[in-house]
From Swiss-Prot:
Organism from which the protein derives: Citrobacter koseri (strain ATCC BAA-895 / CDC 4225-83 / SGSC4696)
PANTHER family: GTP CYCLOHYDROLASE 1 (PTHR11109:SF7), GTP CYCLOHYDROLASE I (PTHR11109)
Name of the gene this protein is made from: folE
Enzyme Commission number: 3.5.4.16
Name assigned to this protein: GTP cyclohydrolase 1
UniProt GO MF annotations: GTP binding; GTP cyclohydrolase I activity; zinc ion binding
Record's catalysed reaction(s): GTP + H2O = 7,8-dihydroneopterin 3'-triphosphate + formate + H(+)
Length: 222
């Protein structure tokens, strides 16, 4: 982790300490992304051939490569902390001590059980202490952790822990409302249900008034 930004390393360490890091095995050896994509493409070719798909067809010919590129560069890019967003934490010179809330954060992730889409929105709030964060950075942190194979409960807590670590305060709350395509597109095929998860820290957990203020913001979003 020595080549990572200080912020990325701190967040990773905090998640490991809380048992919230995504299950990852230690790499057998260092591998660059182009090699990783080449190997994934090869395995994807085998899977498609086992499904009796004709990869000589011009519609399917590049599919293994496209999937490999999508996995490494896009939907699973959050597995690599080298992609952790550059974070700007600013001294709280204005002494802001009221809740800051960001609603309707677009979130697209992947269910780690079936590798199909999780599609939803997040609401994130915090009460500043000594530092505030650029608002777009909250969206970027949500997107970073969404770009992994995930379960929604862990994703919610990872975002909370990352912001607590970076802002130096426990007063953070996160709520995610999402549709899981492992429920919508397979199995029970329920097209209308959604899952809501909430993780509360500091005053959001201990103060009923603060908690209710946050939950009202969440309900307003819904």
């Amino acid at each position: 982790m020595s080549s990572l930004s200080k912020e990325a390393a701190l967040v990773h360490e905090a998640l490991v300490a809380r048992g919230l890091e995504t299950p990852l095995r230690p790499p057998v050896h260092e591998m660059d992304n182009e090699t990783r994509k080449r190997l994934i493409s090869g395995h994807m070719t085998e899977i498609m051939q086992l499904l009796n798909l004709d990869l000589s067809d011009d519609s399917l010919m590049e599919t293994p490569h496209r999937i490999a590129k999508m996995y490494v560069d896009e939907i699973f890019s959050g597995l690599d902390y080298a992609n952790f967003p550059k974070i700007t934490v600013i001294e709280n010179k204005m002494k802001v001590d009221e809740m800051v809330t960001v609603r309707d954060i677009t979130l697209t992730s992947t269910c780690e059980h079936h590798f199909v889409t999780i599609d939803g929105k997040a609401t994130v709030a915090y009460i500043p202490k000594d530092s505030v964060i650029g608002l777009s950075k909250i969206n970027r942190i949500v997107q970073f952790f969404a770009q992994r194979p995930q379960v929604q409960e862990r994703l919610t807590q990872q975002i909370l822990t990352a912001l607590q670590t970076l802002l130096g305060t426990n007063n953070v709350a996160v709520s995610i409302d999402a549709v899981h395509y492992c429920v919508k597109a397979r199995g029970i095929r329920d097209a209308t249900s959604a899952t809501t998860t909430t993780s509360l820290g500091g005053l959001f957990k201990s103060s009923q008034n603060t908690r209710q203020e946050f939950l009202r913001a969440v309900r307003h979003h819904n």
